[in-house]
Amino acid sequence: MANAPHGGVLKDLLVRDAALHDSLLQEARSLNDIFLTERQLCDLELILNGGFSPLEGFMNERDYTSVVETLRLAPYNGQKHGDVFPIPITLDVSQEDINTLGLKQGGRVALRDPRDDAALAILTVSDIYRPNKAIEAEKVMGADDIAHPSVAYLRNNVKEFYVGGKVQAIQAPTHFDYVPLRFTPAELRAHFHKLAWRKVVAFQTRNPMHRAHRELTVRAARQRRANVLIHPVVGLTKPGDVDHYTRVRAYQALMPSYPEGMAHLALLPLAMRMAGPREAVWHAVIRKNFGATHFIVGRDHAGPGKNSQGQDFYGPYDAQELVTQFKDELQIEMVPFQAMTYLPGSDEYQPVDEVPKGTPTADISGTELRKRLRTGASIPDWFSYTGVVKVLRESYPPRPQQGFTILLTGLHNSGKDTIARALQVTLQQQGSRSVSLLLGEELRSDLDPQIGRAITPEQKHINLERIGFVAGELTKAGAAVIAAPTAPYERSRQAFKKQVVGSGGGNYFLVHVATPLEWCEKVDRRGLYKAARAGEIKNLTGVDDVYEAPEDADLVCDLRNDTVPEIVHSIIMILESQNLV
């Protein structure tokens, strides 16, 4: 029998009464709207379907403060203490949002999906409060350190106020990917009941699974005479993780390796916080709501990596210890596990702590696996399954087949456009991949025709972000991208790089065409510098707007001293050193 929901009742808020649905939908049309962020969208979906039971909305200040300080909701209705809930679930807004939307206690506002404008729910505002972000970071993530991705998100993306209140569901967010693998808690519980699964061991993952993971989950199931729920996160995970499309195809390739009827694959639309011990307790609560009776917690569960001092944010077994601390209230049995290692002599996997001293073992680290994928080197059968490796190779081809972006930055007339065109011809001669040329002025007029010569600093930043998005998408598709905007600001170049690295896989190179201003003015046949000095053009970089020279360029060149062929050759040598050409 499936485990009881956290708090005793599954808070499935999804409306099933047609008349009520129509009434709420009609009301939503008359209300002001909050368009949700990707994280808020994930949170709302799990509020609506009961995955976050006993929550019925976004946390008010009383619950938020209690969760941050005590890992519990505030006590209600005579409770001695509230239910365990270790992560604050909040809806952030700005002062401008409050003013524009007329947000106030008792007011109602529609929550919309930014992807299709669909009204998902109506929130009744219980309170509006300003959180102490430093305390939230210290208490929840363990440190106010922006090396932690959730602290960086809190500091850089989360607005200054939180709005608390219960929600009334109109509909769940619509998904078009892997629909047969998406189950609400009620649906998954019904599925377990249909299969007569009395004990279910849930396995949380945000990474592809290989033989060690399969052996680990099978061992856990056998020891407890249970079945296995493979429950990977397909919402927001750690930046740089394998995309969920690739991961789900890899999970599907792995599933036939389980004995018939032992395991089930279902997807979880969770926005992870990478909060280590607190996150492990949160994951246990969520899996309990989905009907699991057991939950696997491993070494450094949901850890984000290193802090600013190069140390781990959490101890290796802090997560297991915190889940154990709350085991009586969680009512879901934790299955602790050590890392698994391969024994070549017996062709089997064993937990590291059970291997006799001196026994030969073999392992492939994540770094080594990425290297083998990048270079096309073999991946042994003892490490993974043929189908899983095939999926990973399709998504992560070897370096000569990967896309890349070269950003040439410099003043107008520095020669960057000439270098870009010459490099384009050279790469096209070599073949093997398409080559796209993104020149700053041409793209500016194409992407935003309203921007003329009088471009403001903020427009320059936005323009480069747009070019970065295009470059990232082309890079992801395997193209060679040469971008040559002025790109005068460091923050803009970093935003551009983030677009390429995040979307395109990290093959990004910066070339600073450092030809000085006096030379650029001397060869300015179009008269832009002359017009700027006469006041006819505003914010021309180098005249009345700053150019911030990059300090991290892969190549610095100057057309006074270097010829275009020499510069192109130097760029090609950089690409060759990375096995990209």
From Swiss-Prot:
Superkingdom as given in the UniProt entry: Eukaryota
Localization annotation: Cytoplasm
Residue(s) at site: Transition state stabilizer: H210, H213
Region N-terminal, residue ranges: 1-176
Activation and inhibition: Allosterically inhibited by 3'-phosphoadenosine 5'-phosphosulfate (PAPS).
Binding sites annotated in the UniProt record for sulfate: Q204, R206, A302
Pfam families from the UniProt entry: APS_kinase, ATP-sulfurylase, PUA_2
GO CC aspect terms: cytoplasm
Positions with a binding annotation for ATP: Q204, T205, R206, N207, G298, R299, D300, H301, M340
Positions of the record's site feature: Induces change in substrate recognition on ATP binding: F337
Region of interest (Catalytic), ranges: 177-401
Major localisation: cytoplasm
Pathway entry: Sulfur metabolism; hydrogen sulfide biosynthesis; sulfite from sulfate: step 1/3
Keyword Repeat: no
Entry domain remark: The adenylyl-sulfate kinase (APS kinase) is non-functional. It is involved in allosteric regulation by PAPS. PAPS binding induces a large rotational rearrangement of domains lowering the substrate affinity of the enzyme.
HAMAP family: Sulf_adenylyltr_euk (MF_03106)
Function field: Catalyzes the first intracellular reaction of sulfate assimilation, forming adenosine-5'-phosphosulfate (APS) from inorganic sulfate and ATP. Plays an important role in sulfate activation as a component of the biosynthesis pathway of sulfur-containing amino acids.
Name this protein carries in UniProt: Sulfate adenylyltransferase
